[in-house]
Amino acid sequence: MDKLKKVLSGQDTEDRSGLSEVVEASSLSWGTRIKGFIACFALGILCSVLGTLLLWVPRKGLGLFAVFYTLGNIMSIGSTVFLMGPLKQLKRMFEPTRLIATILVLLCFALTLCSAFLWNKGLALIFCILQSLALTWYSLSYIPYARDAVKKCFAVCLA
């Protein structure tokens, strides 16, 4: 369990500088981090489910769905900040191996919200689907060799 804590919180090495001790002293306890992660992730799922239920509201449903679905996904990704910390999360998001996936996810978030508020509401539904695909690809980047396995599966299916 301690190894899991160290990996998730970004304390892989035992390098203890003065700055790391200050950050550690002012940070949340492991139990509080887990509770924050669970609460934020649960709120994210609740927003996504609520958005799905609002999809069937006449006239305004599609826009509400896009907004709540996007907010739910943002909260779900944001929940991992509790586990790793904000700086470690940002560093990992923009590592070269997942840079394109991160940009696609953020672009889909922005395009979904723009289409829900400014453009055609039907376009928001398409961007929500693209958002799900981009989030899946982004999530797979955290699992070693998962994206390679998915690529090979699609290559076999399409061949």
From Swiss-Prot:
S-S bonds: none
Residues recorded with modification Phosphoserine: S9
Cytoplasmic topology ranges: 1-36, 85-98, 144-159
Membrane topology term: Multi-pass membrane protein
GO biological process: protein transport; vesicle-mediated transport
Spans within the Lumenal topological domain: 58-63, 120-122
Keyword annotations from UniProtKB, A to Z: Acetylation, Membrane, Phosphoprotein, Protein transport, Transmembrane, Transmembrane helix, Transport
Residues that bear N-acetylmethionine: M1
Entry GO terms, CC: cytoplasm; endomembrane system; intracellular membrane-bounded organelle; membrane
InterPro entries assigned to the protein according to its UniProt record, in alphabetical order: Vesicle_transpt_Got1/SFT2 (IPR007305), Vesicle_transpt_SFT2 (IPR011691)
Sequence intervals crossing the membrane: 37-57, 64-84, 99-119, 123-143
Subcellular location: Membrane
Location (main, coarse): membrane
Protein family: Belongs to the SFT2 family.
Function: May be involved in fusion of retrograde transport vesicles derived from an endocytic compartment with the Golgi complex.
Name of this protein: Vesicle transport protein SFT2B
Species annotation: Mus musculus
The encoding gene: Sft2d2
